[in-house]
């Protein structure tokens, strides 16, 4: 059903030529609409830069200021539920501005990484390998569509749950607009601006995930090639050595791909790790003490979206670390015992490099892994415990 509207989420037949960079089709289109890339036609370069500047000022700077001014000017008019709904999204929004800026600045690095993917694609000549690439490209595009549906569901449900009560969903300040007398005008302005911010946040969350999906695709292909080394009888030692050298080159390209993206994702995941515990804690307090059924559904969707910002990516990073060990095992278990000295010396050097796991870090401080993610999520329960022990919820009611 979805593939009728989004054809790139369906695995393409082998008769069509698919590149690894095609996994970013939908993501790149949305990033282009925000001014995070470059125009295809250079004649529109100035217009595109002006648009990019406008969007950056509006969403990265003016939107957080609008929320902050509303807290200062009308803090006494907030109910406890309104305040928690606003602050949990507001805190996430401040972090989103930093993440979006880092992602936008990482455009050249992402293009550099895609060039490494193009080189890796040249090695995929047999149907079996091309099928794996096609499958992962479709998976990458599906990840974007899945996240888009999830984030849109939160945006719509949160907006409707509040507007039915004639309450502002996010409480933003607009000059010369009375939020009570011009309720629907201000509400529509809120959902439009908040929608832009949500979809920017979506791009920063999906970009690392799709990138690692494609990285794991080529790691899987390399594992298969390592298992098949010296498996074809009748070839010369020089041909076997060239086959091993090609695998060394593939591994170098994978490392170059990850290294190009390392600085881009380090900052975005670091910001998200800092926020996830606080944001989830505020959301849990909102559900436990202040939410109605309609607002509770919106908060649950919000918590799901926040969890999706780190959990799948951390899980993939763990799998890639395991894949590195499996690559070393695959090489060691290949038929190398009867090889000549040149082949064995190259194999020993390559085996040493394969045993070094691919580890990404958040801000150069936290290793990006499931363990780190769980440690950060535990902060949410700490926030809830503090609120319960000091009876803060009752004081707000």
From Swiss-Prot:
Listed GO MF terms: ionotropic olfactory receptor activity; odorant binding; olfactory receptor activity
Keyword check for Ion transport: no
Record's subunit section: Interacts with Orco, via conserved C-terminal cytoplasmic loops. Complexes exist early in the endomembrane system in olfactory sensory neurons (OSNs), coupling these complexes to the conserved ciliary trafficking pathway.
Name of this protein: Odorant receptor 22b
Outcome of mutating residue 4 to K: In strain: LA116, MA18, MA45, MA48, MA50, MA7, MA8, MW25, MW29, MW3, MW32, MW37, MW44, MW46, MW56, MW6, MW7, MW9, NC21a, NC52a, NC62a, NC73a and NC79b
Annotated effect of mutating residue 45 to I: In strain: LA116, MA45, MA50, MW37, MW6 and MW9
Effect of residue 267 to R: In strain: MA45, MA50, MW37, MW6 and MW9
UniProt effect for mutating residue 30 to L: In strain: NC52a and NC73a
Effect of residue 88 to E: In strain: LA116
Outcome, altering residue 201 to A: In strain: NC21a, NC52a, NC62a, NC73a and NC79b
Keyword annotations: Cell membrane, Membrane, Olfaction, Receptor, Sensory transduction, Transducer, Transmembrane, Transmembrane helix
Cytoplasmic side: 1-49, 106-143, 216-268, 317-347
Record annotation: effect of changing residue 102 to F: In strain: MA45, MA50, MW37, MW6 and MW9
GO cellular component annotations of the record: dendrite; dendrite membrane; membrane; plasma membrane
Membrane spanning stretches: 50-70, 86-105, 144-164, 195-215, 269-289, 296-316, 348-368
Organism the protein comes from: Drosophila melanogaster
Consequence the record notes for mutating residue 245 to T: In strain: LA116, MA45, MA50, MW37, MW6 and MW9
Outcome after substituting residue 278 to V: In strain: LA108 and LA120
Result of changing residue 194 to M: In strain: LA116, MA13, MA18, MA43, MA45, MA48, MA50, MA7, MA74, MA8, MW25, MW27, MW29, MW3, MW32, MW37, MW44, MW46, MW56, MW6, MW7, MW9, NC21a, NC52a, NC62a, NC73a and NC79b
Membrane topology, from the record: Multi-pass membrane protein
Reported effect, residue 341 to S: In strain: LA116
A GO biological-process term: detection of chemical stimulus involved in sensory perception of smell
Phylogenetic lineage: Eukaryota, Metazoa, Ecdysozoa, Arthropoda, Hexapoda
Tissue expression summary: Expressed with Orco in 20-22 sensory neurons on the medial-proximal edge of the antenna. This expression pattern matches the distribution of the large sensilla basiconica. Expression is first seen at 60 hours APF in a subset of cells restricted to a subregion of the developing antenna. Expression continues throughout antennal development. Expressed in the ab3A neuron which responds to ethyl butyrate.
Similarity annotation: Belongs to the insect chemoreceptor superfamily. Heteromeric odorant receptor channel (TC 1.A.69) family. Or2a subfamily.
Note: The atypical heteromeric and topological design of the odorant receptors appears to be an insect-specific solution for odor recognition, making the OR/Orco complex an attractive target for the development of highly selective insect repellents to disrupt olfactory-mediated host-seeking behaviors of insect disease vectors. Odor-evoked OR currents are independent of known G-protein-coupled second messenger pathways.
Outcome reported for the amino acid change (mutating residue 156 to F): In strain: MA45, MA50, MW37, MW6 and MW9
